[in-house]
Amino acid sequence: MRRKIPIILGLAFLVFMVQTCKHNPEEGLLKRYFHAVSLNDLTTMSTMALEPVDLEVKSWEITSVSEEEIKPASLPELNKKELELKKKLEDHVGVTLDARDTLDEAEFELENARTRAARNAAQAKVNELQAKYDEIFEEHKELQRQYNEAKAAAAREEEITLFSLGERELLNVRDLTGDIHSKEVDVKIVSKEGEEKTYRFYLRRYNLRDEALGLDHRGRWVIVRSEPVG
């Protein structure tokens, strides 16, 4: 019986450590991250943080951790929005060019008008078509802006997804469904000069599934970004 006691205690300690790591992933991640910071090891920092920040750190301490938020993976919808706006933009190119051509023809007629009446009529036509073209062109610029934003948002989300999954590329990554886990962690950092500053670290982990192939992709906790908050 005495021999079994150390084994039981050892197993209990192991279970405790596993549960601690499971429920407090930020502690282990940030411990490894700040160890790399202390060594000025940018390569290792870059394996844990998308945007590693070079900090002068004497000591650090976690001061608060938000509740873990879980929400559906957003990349499929972001990709859908990007493709829809791309189609709208491409379709609108023809409309914009047609309006420009019509305006150019009217301006040509104005240049070649010989009588005052003809010039007045041509000028009125140009004014009308110019206003119409300006409106269409503004619509085109707005579509271009929306498309650029949607494209950037989808690309950013894809980058974070791949980083959490530990993949350089995944052909169908934009089709994967599942959950995004996120936390915000505030850390008090004391610099080597003794100055205190609080940084907020934004952490995420992706648990996704390829429904077509029936494969699960379990991501790791990573630092998406950090910023000073006080």
Q: What name fits each language-model region?
A:
Residues M1-Q19:
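Sec-dependent bacterial lipoprotein signal peptides
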Residues T20-N24:
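Bacterial signal peptide processing site
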Residues P25-D41, M45:
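Short, aromatic-enriched amphipathic alpha-helices that serve as compact interaction elements
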Residues D41-V57:
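Short, well-ordered alpha-helical segments enriched in acidic and aromatic residues
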Residues P52-K71:
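Short, charge-rich amphipathic alpha-helical segments embedded
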Residues P72-E90:
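Alpha-helical linker/edge segments of TPR/alpha-solenoid repeat scaffolds
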Residues K87-G230:
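Exposed beta-sheet edge and beta->alpha loop/turn motif
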